[in-house]
Amino acid sequence: MKRLIVLLFSLFLALSAQAQGLSINELEYFEETGVNVLVYSNQYNGMFCDEKTAGVEIIQRGERIVTGGGVRLMNTPEQWDIYPDLLSRTVDRKAGSITLGFDYPDYSFKPRIEVKAKGTGFTMAVYLDQPVPAFLEGKAGLNLEFFPASYFGKNVLVDGKAKVLPRYPAGETSMHPVSEKVTQFFGLSTFDDRGRGEFIIPAPFAKGNRIVMAPEDDNLRVSIASSEELNIFDGRNLAQNGTFVVRTFLPAGKTGKVVEWDVQPAYDPAWVRKPNIGYSQIGYAPGAKKVAVLELDKNDPVAPEATLFRVAEDGSLQAEKQVPVENWGVFNNRYNYARANFSDVRKPGLYLLEYKGTRTSPFPIADDIYADTWHPTMDVWLPVQMDHMEVNEGYRIWHGRSHMDDALQAPVNYEQQDGYRQGPSTNTKYESYEHIPNLAVGAWYDAGDFDIQSGTVIGLTTQLAALWESQRPERDQTFIDQKTQFVDIHRPDGVPDVIQQCEHGVLNIIAQVENIGFVVQGIVQPTMHQYHHLGDASTITDGLVYDPSLEPYQQVGLRSGTRDDRYAFTGNGATPSGQMSTIAALAAAARVLKPYSPEVADRALKNALKLWEENYEAADPARMMGNAGGFGRGFGGFGGFDGRVQAAVQLWRTTGEQKYRDFFEPIVLAQLQPREMPRGGNFGGFRNQGAARGVEVPMAELGSGAAWGGFMRGGSDLSTALALYNDMDEAFKEAVRKAVPAYAQGLMAQAGNNPYGVPISGRGWGGNEQILGWMINMYNVWKLFPDQIDPQLILDGMNYIYGCHPYSNVSFITAVGVDTKKVAYGNNRADYTFIPGGLVPGLLVMAPDYLECKDDYPFHWGENECCTRNAVQIVVCSLACEEIAHSLK
C-alpha cells in the first residue's frame, strides 16, 4: 500500500511538473520558476546602438545569459551594426504569444517574429510577407546571443557531437569586398582596412539542427532545435565585446513562416535562488549601524534568524550572536527583502554572517576601516587615466605618452559617434583639419575610452581644488614630472598628489584657452576604429602631426600623412555661459597651486580674469535663453540658474575683490527660498514603492553648481551657500541656517522607499555616482550643522557602494574590499580585468523589473565603465566616512 501511495504521489508530481510552463505575466514577459524570457522589454539605444541589453533575452536562475534575439543582418552583430526599427509589439497573454513587427528602412525589409510559449520553453518563428531582398540574401538571419564569459569552461552539443566552447577566439574568417557590407550607423566603420576596401566575415565554428549550450550546467543549459540549419559563431573574432551567436540564415525566395526554433531553457520547478546577503566588503566601524540586507527568492520563506560568527586566529568559527531577521517586503517586483541588524556588536575583530546555509566572506569590525580605502583611486586609477603622459608602475608600463599629435580642428558640418558634432563654423581661427598647436599637455581620459571630455577636465580640476581646501589629503605616492611627461606610481616626489593632479587638469585648460580662446566641447578620436581602441593609448595615433601634403602612412620628421590625430570639437564650447565653469576651475586651481607652482597659478588666474571680462555680459541667462538646448556632449545647460555665480565665487575667493561678492551674494541668497516640488518614495521609478509626495524643499535642491559636479549639475544651490558659509557675514549665515532644515530633510527623504535606504537609480546608466553625490551633499550639511543630518545615512551610502546592494554583494570600487568587482569597462577590459580604484556605475535598471551589474562581462558600460569624474567623489566620501566613524566612538 505504501509503495502504491508513493507511486501515485510521484505520478502526481510528474503530472504537475508537466503542467507547468512558461506564461506571460502582468509585466508582459514569459515567466516560470527560474526562467524569464524578455521579448523586447528593452529596446536598442539610438545613440549607443547595440548595448547587448535588448531583443529577445533569457534570464535563467537569476542571471541574464542570453540577449539580442531577433532578425539581424550580420553573423556577429557589433555595437555599431544596424538593428531594425520596432514597429509593433503585440502581447496576447491568453495565447501565450508576443508578436513583433520590424523594419529595416534602408532595405525595405519588414520581418515579423512570433515568440510563443511551448511547455517550459518557447518557439521563435520568423514571418515574411515579401522575400528577403536580394542584397540581404545570405546576410539576414535569426540570431540569439550568449554571453561568452558565462560559458567559459563549458561545452556544447551539436547534433549530439561534443565540442568545447572556446575561451579565446581562434575561429575562421574570410575577407569580402566592402561593396557587400551592410552599412554601419553614421556611415562609419569599426574596421581599419588600411584603404583596401574590404571587411571581415566570421565563419561558424559549428553547425547542425540541434544545439545544446552547456549541457552539463543547469544554470546555463539552453537547447535550440530547428529543421533549418543552426550555426554557432564567435563574435570575438571581430570585437572583444562579441558574443557566441546561434544563427539561422533566412532562406531566399520564401514568404510566410520561413524559420522556426524550439528553445528550451533549463527548468526546475523546485529551484530557489540562494540568498544574496548584502553587506559592506570593507567591514564596519564599531559605533556604526550594521545592517545586512537579504535579497530573497519570493518562494523562499524568511527565516527568523541569521548567525554572526567571529573568526578566531586558528580559523575556527565562534557564534557571536543570533541576529533577528526582519522581513521588509517585495521591492521592484522580482525579489523579497529582509534585514538583519547586528549593530550592538561593537567588539573589534573578524566576522562573517550566515543565513540559511549561505555565508558571507569574513569582514572586519575596526576603528580604521575607511583609512586607506581611497588610496587605490588616487594612487593607481587616476594616474592611469592621465593623458599625454607615460605611466609606469613597478615593472609595468600602463601606457606610453599618448596623443602627442593633438589636435586637429574638427571639420565643419560634421557629426560622429558619441554625440559629437561641429556646426557650420569652427568658431576659431583654425580651418577644418588644421593642426591646433600646444594641446599635448595635461587632462585625463574621460572613462573607458580615450577622449578628453572637457566638462570632465573642468569638473575634476575644480573638485581637486575643493578637495584640497576642504579635507587636505597630503598623501604623496605618485611621481609626476610634467617636463618629461612621466608618471611613476608608488613613488613619492615631495608634492601632494592632489596638488599635482589639479595642476595636470589646469595645464590642459590653460592650453585650450591660450591656443583656441576657450575650452572646447571635447578632443576625441575621429574614427570608429580608434574610438573602440583597447590597450595602450599611445598606439591609437602615430604621435605625429598630420600633414595633408604627405601620403597616408608616410612619415617625414615629426609629421605624417595619416589623419589619425584627435579632433577638437569647437562648436558648443564657445558659448559665453559655457566658459563660466572654465573660469571657476582656473580661479580655484590658481588659489591652491600658488604655493607649489606659482607660474602655472598665475597663468590660470590671468586666463580666468580674461574670460570673465570677455564673457560676463553675454553669459547673462536673460541673453542666453534663446540659445537654450544648444549645448552638446560635454557641456550642460544651467537649469535656469546663472552660471556666472560659481565663476564669481571662485574669483572672489582667489582675488578678494568685492565686485565678485557683490554679484554672487544676492543670487545665492535668493536661491535659499523654498518652493514646492514633488519628492519622495519612488526615486528610481521602481515597482512596489510608495507614491511620491509633494513636500516643501529649497529651490536649491533642483540643481548644483558646487565643486563636486556629477550628481546634480546646473547653477548654484545650497551647496554653494554651505561652501561659502565660514567666509561670510552673520546675515548670510542666518539666512543659510534658516534654509538648512528643509534642505536637510529633502536630502534625507531621498533615501527612498527601498530596503537599502539609499536613492537607487540607474536607467541607462548605473546610479552609484548619484549616491556619492547625495552623500557629499549630506556631509556638507553635517559638518556645519551636525544636528540636522543623520550621519548614519552617509555611512549607509558607502555600505551600499561596498557591497550592501541588490544583485550581488561585491564592492563597486575595484580592488577595494574583500570581494570586489572582477571586471570593469576600462582600457584593459579586453583582458576581462580592471584598473584598481575605479567606481563602476553599478546596477542597471532594466525593464520591467531586473537589476543587473554583470561581473563576468565587462563590456556593459552602463554597469561597468569607471568614469574619471568620480575619482574625487570617492576620496571625499571615504574621508567623510572616516570622520563620521571617529565621531561615533
Model-identified regions with their sequence ranges:
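Aromatic (Trp/Tyr) and acidic
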Residues: 189-215, 219, 282, 290-356, ...
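Acidic (Asp/Glu-rich), glycine- and aromatic
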Residues: 123-168, 359-369
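Extended, loop-rich substrate-binding clefts of extracytoplasmic carbohydrate-active enzymes
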Residues: 72-132
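Long, well-ordered core segments of solenoidal/helical folds
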Residues: 368-392, 499-517, 605-623, 658-701, ...
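Bacterial N-terminal signal peptides
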Residues: 6-16
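Low-complexity, Pro/Ser/Thr- and charge-rich linker/hinge segments at domain boundaries
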Residues: 150-157, 270-289, 361-399
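Beta-strand-rich recognition/accessory modules
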Residues: 193-271, 881
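Beta-strand-rich N-terminal accessory domains
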Residues: 20-71, 171-201
